[in-house]
């Protein structure tokens, strides 16, 4: 059976807190390794004395969760358990048996969001409903477990973009996809009629995935990707941020400053119950703030005050 694997870096000082958090949210197993292994800074721990438990200064922790676990739910629970720890560098992946990837490809079917937006894996024929001039079709690799449209946070954003396109508020507009991941939202926005898009993410692999998906969908000339520190300071008519509630709170000033007067914003990655604080956080800059729910997840959207 597959497992969800979490990896993070910590110090000997913060290790107990990370360990307590992982145990609390249901980790099946936790292992620790020297983060400097196979480098000149590697330190061997051979035979500790009685009652001693020496550890490395820098550690890599790996935790396993049940394969049915939702990575974003796990991460949100960890942040809620100990918000004082830095969870921003946590990485997830599926530890799978040899048949998992093929099973995922078979399970990942074409999906429709709103009236005209379709996410279609490359190994599937185009659905009849998507084979129209009005349809916005994004083709994705079925191996992408996250940012593929299957998670509620992504689905909430895709439906929002589709509704903007339906009301004519996306045609010819500039778009910022903050925390772009696979780039699915930026690519979908371009397919729906946006003039140009910028993807921002702190993971270089995410930027590569976004650029690759843009190229494969024929919109690479309209999309540029940046690390957060390299993003040009400018405003956009449409901003979408599908990250976690803690990051949305911390980045409120930054995200608000990126939205042009009269522009639209959508915030996702918010668990039900976290929306009230974020509504208050963004109220100084945005009117018409409203929420939409999909199972345990919420989206907030609004209009930038002039």
Curated annotation (Swiss-Prot):
Query: What's the top EC group for this one?
Result: transferase
Alphabetically ordered keywords of this record: Cytoplasm, Methyltransferase, S-adenosyl-L-methionine, Transferase
User: Where along the chain is S-adenosyl-L-methionine bound?
Assistant: 154, 179, 201, 242
Annotated GO biological processes are: methylation
Q: Which reaction does it catalyse?
A: L-lysyl-[protein] + 3 S-adenosyl-L-methionine = N(6),N(6),N(6)-trimethyl-L-lysyl-[protein] + 3 S-adenosyl-L-homocysteine + 3 H(+)
Q: Cellular component terms, GO, for this chain's entry?
A: cytosol
**Enzyme Commission no:** 2.1.1.-
- InterPro entries with a match to the protein in the record: Ribosomal_L11_MeTrfase_PrmA, Ribosomal_PrmA_MeTrfase, SAM-dependent_MTases_sf
HAMAP family for this protein:
Methyltr_PrmA
Concerning its family, UniProt says: Belongs to the methyltransferase superfamily. PrmA family.
Q: What does this protein do?
A: Methylates ribosomal protein L11.
Supply the name of the protein: Ribosomal protein L11 methyltransferase
Q: Which organism is it from?
A: Xanthomonas euvesicatoria pv. vesicatoria (strain 85-10)
């Amino acid at each position: 059976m597959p497992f969800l694997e979490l990896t993070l870096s910590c110090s000997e000082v913060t290790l107990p807190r990370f360990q307590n958090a992982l145990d609390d949210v249901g980790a099946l197993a936790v292992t620790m390794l020297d983060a400097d292994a196979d480098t000149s800074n590697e330190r061997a721990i051979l035979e500790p004395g009685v009652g001693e438990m020496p550890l490395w200064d820098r550690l890599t922790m790996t935790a396993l969760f049940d394969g049915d676990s939702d990575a974003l739910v796990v991460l949100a629970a960890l942040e809620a358990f100990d918000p004082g720890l830095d969870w921003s560098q946590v990485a997830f992946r599926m530890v799978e048996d040899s048949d998992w990837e093929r099973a995922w490809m078979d399970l990942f079917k074409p999906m429709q969001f709103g009236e005209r937006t379709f996410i279609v894996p490359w190994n599937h024929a185009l659905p009849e409903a998507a084979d129209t001039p009005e349809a916005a079709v994004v083709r994705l690799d079925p191996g992408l477990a996250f940012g593929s449209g299957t998670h509620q946070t992504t689905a909430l954003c895709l439906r929002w973009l589709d509704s903007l396109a339906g009301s004519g508020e996306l045609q010819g507009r500039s778009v910022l996809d903050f925390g772009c991941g696979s780039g699915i939202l930026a690519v979908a926005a371009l397919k729906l009629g946006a003039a140009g898009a910028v993807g921002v993410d702190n993971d270089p692999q995410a930027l590569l995935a976004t650029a690759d998906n843009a190229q494969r969908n024929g919109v690479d000339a309209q999309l540029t990707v940046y690390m957060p520190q390299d993003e040009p300071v400018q405003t956009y008519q449409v901003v979408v941020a599908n990250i976690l509630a803690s990051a949305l709170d911390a980045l409120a000033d930054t995200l608000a400053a990126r939205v042009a007067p009269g522009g639209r914003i959508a915030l996702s990655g918010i668990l039900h119950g976290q929306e009230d604080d974020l509504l208050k956080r963004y109220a100084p800059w945005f009117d018409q703030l409203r929420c939409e729910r999909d199972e345990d997840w919420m989206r907030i959207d609004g209009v930038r005050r002039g």
